[in-house]
Amino acid sequence: MTSNLAIARGALDNIPPVALACSRWLIVFLIFFPFVYQTIQKKRKDFKNEFWKLFFLSATGYAGCGALPYVSGLTTTVTNMSIIYALSPIFIVLLSAYIYKERLKYLQYCAVLLSLFGVSFIIFKGNLNNFLNLNFSIGDVWIFGAAICWSLFSIFLINWKSKFNIIERFTLMSLLGSLILIPFFLIEHFLFL
């Protein structure tokens, strides 16, 4: 993901953020589709049965987590993006506990706090002044949204079983992610550029 955050800041001078995310997933779909076409054809009924789960996973993990870091990169720093996105594992633990009504054990709370401290220590290089001098922007809200999307995607990807193997599922979610992003691409293209 770190390289993705750097791309979010670097490539945006040439390619708008939603266009970048949409084309990225469309290219992935086009590369993988020839290899899974026949098996997906045979599993059309499974696709129909799993459509909303695949749609949710595509919306969170592919569209949301694919586009929001790029949108964020327009108005925030890679450092801020890294700090906020590094909170994803903590969000996964907390959201999973909330969604599945599980009580966190004492050691899990300790692990969350320890990882939060560790991430903060590394990013701020152990210097409190680095933390105090942070400036936040709207881009930080977008990357926070991406971290939440990634967390939800991770939780449900593990817990939702599928009739599709990993490559078939990846290909279908790449297509759905692209399709979800197309309206936002059109808005970006015609209203903002």
Predicted regions and their residues:
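Glycine-/small-residue-enriched transmembrane alpha-helix faces in small-molecule transporters
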Residues: 1-22, 132-159, 179-184
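Specific transmembrane alpha-helical segments of multi-pass solute transporters/efflux pumps
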Residues: 1-5, 33-85, 121
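Juxtamembrane C-cap of transmembrane helices in multi-pass membrane transport proteins
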Residues: 3-15, 27, 66-76, 84, ...
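Hydrophobic/aromatic residues within transmembrane alpha-helices
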Residues: 11, 20, 24, 72, ...
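C-terminal transmembrane-helix exit sites in multi-pass transporters
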Residues: 31-40, 88-113, 117
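Hydrophobic transmembrane alpha-helices of multi-pass small-molecule transport proteins
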Residues: 32, 104-126, 147, 175, ...
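Loop-to-transmembrane alpha-helix entry segments
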Residues: 45-52, 82-85, 101-121, 136-137
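Residue-level signature of transmembrane alpha-helical cores of multipass secondary-active transporters
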Residues: 54-58, 70, 82, 112, ...
